[in-house]
Amino acid sequence: MNSLRILIVDDSPAMRAYVRRTVQLASLPVKNVFEAGNGVEALEIVRKENREPNKLDLIFADLNMPVMNGEEFVQKLREDERDANVPVLIISTDATQKRVTRLRELGAQGYISKPCQPEMIRLKVQQLLGEEPSLSRREL
């Protein structure tokens, strides 16, 4: 796995710090971590940072944020073909099956319920980026 460029989108600074720390402690080769407090800020970062030769490798996004929520963010992100292939992992407390299905239809690749364990984040990242998880490959 190459050095990763990751974007964390959450209105909670504490949650952004938690995800950042978890990714770093998971022994993943992180090169850059960008942070945004809502979907509008995230799109600005994506439009600036997700360009050749330094594309983003993964986006973590919350659902319930001010200005632009996570669902709107994923939808807007997928409208630009240059950003259509960046994996998006949703981390949120809003875990209804209907909502998860809608997010997958919009283009999110995974979902983790808050509060989330560091091991769950690591396993999901490995799955999304094509690494063989060290635990079972059950659907998370």
Question: What residue ranges belong to the model's regions?
Answer:
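Two-component/phosphorelay signaling modules centered on CheY-like receiver
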Residues: 13-34
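Acidic, metal-coordinating helix/loop segments flanking the phosphotransfer/catalytic sites
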Residues: 35-58
